Amino acid sequence: IVFLILLKKEENQLEVIIKKNRIINDLKKDNYTLYYQPIVDFKHNRVRSVEALLRLRKDGKLLTPYHFMKDIEDANMMKEITLWVLKRVIKDYNIIRCYDNINEKDFYISLNVSFNEIKDREFLKKIVKIVNDNKIIKNSICLEIVEKFVVGEIEKIQENINFLQDNGILIAIDDFGVEYSNLDLLKKIDSNIIKLDKFFADGINDSEISLKVIDFILDICRLSDKSIVIEGIEEKEQVDIIKTFLYEKIYIQGYYFSKPLDIKSLKAYTF
């Protein structure tokens, strides 16, 4: 039995090495790429920001993270990939901000980071160094934290968020409302942006509760001067309802306005 356990352990270790080498090879061959989904300021008919979304070119196909992210996690390569994304985002930022459809004054690009990454101060120092070394404009990069906060670690997370914000990096809480009904999180985590999960958008047409929840979160955002992005908007009726909310810092992301675009297609994007 002990022999079988050791054999299985060796097989698992070998599998991790194979996955890691494959990922490193894909990085070297530039098989990873970024697509950008516009976040729209419908009040001023402009692109407020874009979210960077990782894709992998493989065997003539363009794969979403659903098909390759587990391998990255298994190989313990998430942080390396995040730093690669950040460097590519900074490179692309200087191109995208000059597009005619972009308001370059306060334009930013967001990228996703995990809860484990945002806990790691040494890793965050690497992020800050990359941003500072590239002399990127303050508040041009936003880190989106998926809302899976561990209650006992919120104080440490807020300290790390303060560190990032002090270095000119915006913070967004992504998928807000999924993991918690915990609106107390808005008080404890001082983010710049709240991204409201698609769950609320799906019910906005026919659910009074969804409308009330959004209205309530908007009130909190007004008081704390946070921006809010409503995700997953796919229908005109949803947009029309959102337009009735009286708040200057409300923005929309979803397929109604645009699917994720490569950097060249983004230049020609209009809505």
Q: What spans do the regions from the language model cover?
A:
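EAL-family c-di-GMP phosphodiesterase catalytic domain
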Residues: I1, E11-N12, F42, F115-K119, ...
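Charged helix-capping and loop-helix junction motifs
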Residues: K125-V128, K156-E159, E208-D215
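Short acidic-capped amphipathic helix/loop micro-motif used as an active-site/signal-coupling element
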Residues: K58-L62, L86-I90, D175, G254
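C-di-GMP signaling machinery
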Residues: V2-T33, I72-N76, F115-E117, I263-F271
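Active-site core of bacterial EAL-family cyclic-dinucleotide phosphodiesterase domains
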Residues: N12-D71, I173, S258-P260
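Catalytic-site-adjacent helices and loops of nucleotide signaling machinery
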Residues: V16, K61-P65, D74-A75, T82, ...
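Catalytic core of bacterial c-di-GMP phosphodiesterases, primarily the EAL and HD-GYP domains
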Residues: I81-K156, G232
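Surface-exposed amphipathic alpha-helices with a cationic face
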Residues: N94-R97, N132, Q158-D166, D215-R222, ...
